[in-house]
Regions:
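Hydrophobic positions on the alpha1 helix immediately C-terminal to the Walker A/P-loop
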Residues: 14, 18
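Conserved substrate/cofactor phosphate-moiety recognition/catalytic segment
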Residues: 20-65
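Hydrophobic anchor at the beta1->P-loop junction of P-loop NTPases
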Residues: 3
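Conserved lysine of the Walker
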Residues: 11
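P-loop (Walker A) phosphate-binding loop of NTP-binding proteins
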Residues: 6
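NTP-dependent small-molecule kinase module
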Residues: 128-137, 142-203
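Soluble or luminal CAZymes and related metallo-dependent hydrolases
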Residues: 52-60, 96-101, 142-150
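ATP-dependent NMP and nucleoside kinases share a basic, alpha-helical "lid"
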Residues: 68-72, 77-136
Length: 203
């Protein structure tokens, strides 16, 4: 499939959103239009913790299965989510749900990423990014508190999680090469092939 059109018409966004819909719903440019809207509503309201966690476990599992089917020597495949993700989010729910949530998180035992990058940040950076994404169901102050809680769990769990590195993303932008190069170096990722750009004389 190819998406074409003039500059600024929305090609990149459409490619990302459609690719997301056709690839288990985890990489879209904002989740609106991709996820069932009840997922975000329930996250914001703190409802249905086991259902929310099971949904993400199913999304992650589908992507790990897809990655396994498409893996090959020299190939680098990125997935969002790992067992540590499901475990870190347990902290945001009342203790009476924790046993059921741990049972859901155990699904992540089958996932074996070569590297897990835990992104962490200051609350100022997080507030800026939450404001920028402007989700209809998000209260910014509540989301910042939620981030602090979950971020602390990621930091606590990371030392015991295999092949896991914690990277503070403050000051890093992922829309420019410097930020990406920093992540690649810090995580010890393999080199990537770059298509060269050349100035060429007209004929």
């Amino acid at each position: 499939m190819a998406i074409v059109g003039g500059p600024g018409v929305g090609k990149s966004t459409l490619v990302r959103q459609l690719a997301d819909l056709y690839h288990n719903g985890s990489y879209g440019e904002g989740e609106k239009g991709v996820w069932d809207p009840r997922v975000l509503q329930d996250i914001e309201a703190g409802r249905n913790p086991v259902g929310v966690t099971a949904y993400f476990a199913a999304v992650y599992d589908a992507n790990y299965r897809s990655a396994s089917a498409h893996d090959a020597p020299g190939k680098v495949i990125f997935c969002e989510g790992a067992r540590i993700t499901l475990e870190a989010h347990i902290a945001e729910y009342p203790p009476e749900h924790h046993d059921a949530l741990r049972r859901v998180a155990a699904q992540g035992d089958a996932w074996r990423p070569d590297r897990v990058i835990v992104l962490t940040s200051s609350t100022d950076t997080i507030e800026k990014h939450i404001l920028r994404r402007a989700r209809a169901h998000e209260d910014v102050a509540k989301m910042v508190l939620r981030f602090r809680l979950i971020d602390a769990e990621f930091r606590r769990l990371a030392p015991g999680s295999p092949n896991t590195i914690v990277i503070n993303r403050d000051g890093l932008e992922f829309h420019d090469r410097a930020g990406l190069d920093y992540i690649i170096a810090a995580a010890g990722l393999p080199p990537f092939a770059e298509i060269p750009y050349q100035e060429m004389a007209g004929t």
